[in-house]
Amino acid sequence: LAAAAAVRHAIKLAVANQVPIALGTDAGVVPHGTNAHEFVLMVQWGGMTPMDSIVAGTSNAARLLGWDKNLGSLTTGKWADIVAVPGNPLQDIENMQKVTFVMKNGVVYRTSN
């Protein structure tokens, strides 16, 4: 519990001080497929707006990794992998966890649920 409280405090400090935040991990200890929950945590724990959490997972992540010339936004000439969710994540950020399909390289992959 102390570690979770420390993480919450760190996120709030970073948000309050306008530190650029990228959503995601390359840590082997975090189960793959749960990253969408980070959008929710950034809003609930960090006080981000839903849009700020989405930016953290898209354009901020690309920029902070040095890949923003190729990805991170829906811009002509950039690579685009797109996720679709059933509702507006700006109204309910938990919609980011309800992916209905992913489009990668122009091919649509639908979820089974």
Listing of model-derived features with the role each one plays in the protein:
Residues L1-P89:
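His/Asp/Glu-enriched, well-ordered alpha-helical/loop segment
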Residues P89-N95:
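Short, Lys/Arg- and Gly-enriched loop/turn segments at beta-strand edges
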